């Protein structure tokens, strides 16, 4: 979700082909995944995260994302993106001529270690290198923060930590800045507090927000974000 500079415009991005499918026990073939994405495009969606370039041993549901990309029709006016977690993922995106990547750093030490095997400070260094590679190859980039509103493992996450990470990312990334409620911990007041703090640094019109409905607050959180 992103609110445009025109306050009457809200952009929605479909992430189901990545965030949805990676949690499913059934592993779909690249052909089926590509067909799903094409059907989503046919609904009128203009922003779709088609998958991720990650270790297939860790996330087998995302194996073959390169083939998914090759199978797609690449409709004009649609922004196709992939999530990348390391430099190898960026290099795959470059090799496959994917025009847009998303790079995220967790604000939670525990989540960062479990997700990437790195402490936040080290993950941030890696992320800035990844963004630099993408930008130098003229790719679009969304740089962002996972667990920006709280963490399943650690509970609340200091907003100062989120702002610190965003400050480092936006210094090298000229594009959108993402704030992800990765484990569905956010409440509307959390949404407002974090967006206001980060927005004062980078501008609210650059922010995107990724939400979950884990505790039945997804719509309330969305409305809180749109109102800002």
Predicted regions mapped to residue ranges:
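Glycine-rich, positively charged N-terminal anion/phosphate-binding segment
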Residues: 2, 30-78, 84-92, 97-100
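Catalytic alpha/beta core domains of metabolic enzymes, predominantly
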Residues: 182-228
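Conserved anion-binding
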Residues: 107-182
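N-terminal small/glycine-rich loop or linker at the start of catalytic domains
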Residues: 2-25, 102-115, 136-153, 198, ...
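Alpha-helix-loop-beta-strand connector modules within alpha/beta enzyme cores
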Residues: 58-82, 121-143, 164-169, 191-209
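Active-site mouth loops of central-metabolism enzymes
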Residues: 12-34, 78-87, 113-120, 147-161, ...
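Glycine-rich, proline-tolerant flexible connector loops at the mouths of alpha/beta enzymes
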Residues: 46-71, 104-118, 147-154, 178-189
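Conserved, mostly hydrophobic/aromatic
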Residues: 20, 40, 93, 101, ...
């Amino acid at each position: 979700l992103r609110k445009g500079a025109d306050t009457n415009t809200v952009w929605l991005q479909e992430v189901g082909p990545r965030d949805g499918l990676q949690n499913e026990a059934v592993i779909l073939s690249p052909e089926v995944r590509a067909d799903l994405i094409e059907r989503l495009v046919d609904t009128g969606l203009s922003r779709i995260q088609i998958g991720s370039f990650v270790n297939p041993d860790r996330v087998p549901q995302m194996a073959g994302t390169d083939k998914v990309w090759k199978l797609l029709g690449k409709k004009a006016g649609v922004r196709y993106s992939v999530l990348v977690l390391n430099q190898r993922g960026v290099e795959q995106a470059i090799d496959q001529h994917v025009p847009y990547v998303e790079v995220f750093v967790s604000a939670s030490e525990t989540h960062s270690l479990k997700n990437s095997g790195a402490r936040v400070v080290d993950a941030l260094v890696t992320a800035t290198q990844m963004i630099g590679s993408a930008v130098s190859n003229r790719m679009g980039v969304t740089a962002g923060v996972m667990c920006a509103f709280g963490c399943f493992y650690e509970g609340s996450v200091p907003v100062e930590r989120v702002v610190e990470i965003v400050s480092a990312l936006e210094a090298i990334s000229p594009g959108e800045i993402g704030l992800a409620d990765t484990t569905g911990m956010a409440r509307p007041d959390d949404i407002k507090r974090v967006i206001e703090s980060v927005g004062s640094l980078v501008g609210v019109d650059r922010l995107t927000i990724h939400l979950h409905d884990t505790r039945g607050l997804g719509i309330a959180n969305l409305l809180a974000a749109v109102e800002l």
